[in-house]
Amino acid sequence: LGLIDYKKCWDYQEELFAEILAIKSANRKENKTESTKNHLILCEHLHVYTLGKSGDKKNLLVNENYLKSRGATFHKINRGGDITYHGPGQIVGYPILDLDNFFTDIHKYLRFLEEAVILTLKEYGLDSERSPGETGVWFDVGTPKREKSVH
C-alpha cells in the first residue's frame, strides 16, 4: 500500500477481516465450504504510536499534544502488545488470515511467522533473531533501541 495513514490502513484491515468473518458465518448457516481469502498487507506509516489492549498508556513517555506537535498520531487498538512506534522507512506487514486454514494455536502461529521473517531477512543478508520472552524478530538482541525490531 506504500506510505499510508495508520487509521486508513486499520480500517482496510478491519474490512478484510469482516469479509473473512462473513464468509465463515455464511458457510456455517448455509452448510457451504466457500474458502476464505488470506491477505498480507505491506506498507509504511506516517509517524504513529499504537497502544495494544495489553499495554499501559503510562508507558507512552510523552503526551498526545507533544506527539501532535511532532506530526505523530496515537491510536488505541484491539490487538496485543504495548506501545509500538511505526514510521516512514519502516516496512510493516499485517497478515490477515483465517487461522483455521493453518492452525489455531496463536503462539505456534507467531513462532512460524517469526521464523518466516528471519529466513526472509537472511536471504537479503540481514541477521536477525528472536529475543527471549518477547514476540517479534530483532536486530542486535540486547540493544535497548526497540526501533531495531520487527513485530
Which residues fall in each region the model found?
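N-terminal lobe of the biotin/lipoate ligase/transferase fold
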Residues: 1-146
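Catalytic cores of processing enzymes, dominated by hydrolases/peptidases
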Residues: 147-151
